[in-house]
UniProtKB/Swiss-Prot annotation:
Protein name: UPF0250 protein Sfri_0694
InterPro entries per UniProt: UPF0250_YbeD-like, YbeD-like_sf
Superkingdom: Bacteria
NCBIfam families assigned: PRK04998.1
Protein family membership: Belongs to the UPF0250 family.
Top-level taxonomy: Bacteria, Pseudomonadati, Pseudomonadota, Gammaproteobacteria, Alteromonadales
Gene Ontology CC annotations of this record: cytosol
Organism, as annotated: Shewanella frigidimarina (strain NCIMB 400)
Pfam name, any one: DUF493
Length: 88
């Protein structure tokens, strides 16, 4: 087992990809971008894909994070978006 900590593995600031999976809703990507803007203002161009049956959308977005706590906040805030099922 490695004796390294999370902070030793990652360098900050870091552009981290987040995949947000939620109900198929045309506003999901806009809501993900709005949360990303609150976390780290910038120009965001998310990638949106529909599931095979069209029931869900996955929105992939890169957010520049500055610490482990910032990553944790991103997961919490993105998961709090209405209709979101998972954040990876």
């Amino acid at each position: 087992m490695l004796n390294t900590t999370f902070d030793q593995v990652m360098e900050f600031p870091n552009s981290c990809p987040f995949k947000v999976i939620g109900d198929a809703d045309d506003t999901l990507a806009d809501r993900v971008v709005a949360v990303a803007q609150q976390l780290a203002p910038g120009d965001y161009v998310p990638s949106v894909k529909a599931s095979s049956k069209g029931s869900y959308y996955s929105v992939t977005i890169r957010i520049t994070v500055t610490s482990k706590e910032h990553i944790e906040k991103a997961y919490i805030d993105l998961a709090a978006i209405e209709g979101v099922k998972r954040v990876l």
